[in-house]
Amino acid sequence: MNVLTEIKTENLKSFENNPFIFREDTAFEMLIDSISNLGVLTPIIVRSIEDGNYEIISGHRRAEACRRLGIETIPCIVKELTRDEATVILVDLNLQRDEVLPSEKAHAYKMKMDALKNQGARTDLTSTQSVSKFRTAEEVGKENNESRETVRRYIRLTYLIPEILKLVDEGRIAFTPAVELSFLPSEEQHEVYGFYENEEVTPSYSQTVRMKKLYSEGMLTSDKISDIMAEAKANQKDFLKIPTENINKYFKSRFTEKQKQEFVIKAVEHYHRFLMRQRDAG
């Protein structure tokens, strides 16, 4: 049963362990303007929790925009849902967004798999239940037109240390080598990240496959990791590292990494045109 009602913003709580990052971007500023002029046109979706509060399933940005504007109540659709049912809806709705980071998708798929498992869809890794596991992975990807294997590979990213997962989000490490790195223990992953910090190089797919194989054979050492990472790669991208404290004042608050990169590129292009005009004038 669904109930449409007005709920105070102070009683609306963010979804616990929400895998999707809140972005304070241009779209959010436009949302604030829209709500300021027209109000909340689409009710947010919530479920009742303890102490007279409600957990937001869909509409975190609308709720935050209302808080910024000092709007005290928001139209809400209250659904009678368990935590697991709410998780499935949260994931399916948010994965329809235009921009979803690999880390967001990874944690979202894992949350949905766990929710389906709790609802009775077995995802155990035992051989006798492997077929059920595959079917559950297929169900998770069904809403987003992704295969069960793709879903399972995204979930592997949740085994990465945060530093490497951030490199995946930034596009510095590609998806397939990141999946292979996820099979290494955190200590070895920190070794790989340490080499990246010192030398500004990331591993290729073939290098991560070799590291994974060496680890499975009990032969992966710090020296082996350094030797593999030090190999020349024809397709290695060059990155310019700029301390963010030197340029953060020029960014709007809560810019994403992609937005920061685009801003810096536009600034460099603008400055280059300025120098060319000065040269032509002089």
Tell what function each PLM region has.
Residues 144, 148-265:
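Amphipathic alpha-helical extensions and coiled-coil-like segments
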Residues 97-184:
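Alpha-helical interaction elements
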Residues 1-79, 85-99:
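Short, charged/polar connector segments at secondary-structure boundaries
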Residues 24-27, 31, 61-62, 87, ...:
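Helical mechanochemical/support elements of P-loop NTPase systems and associated helical scaffolds
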Residues 272-282:
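Short acidic DE-rich linear segments
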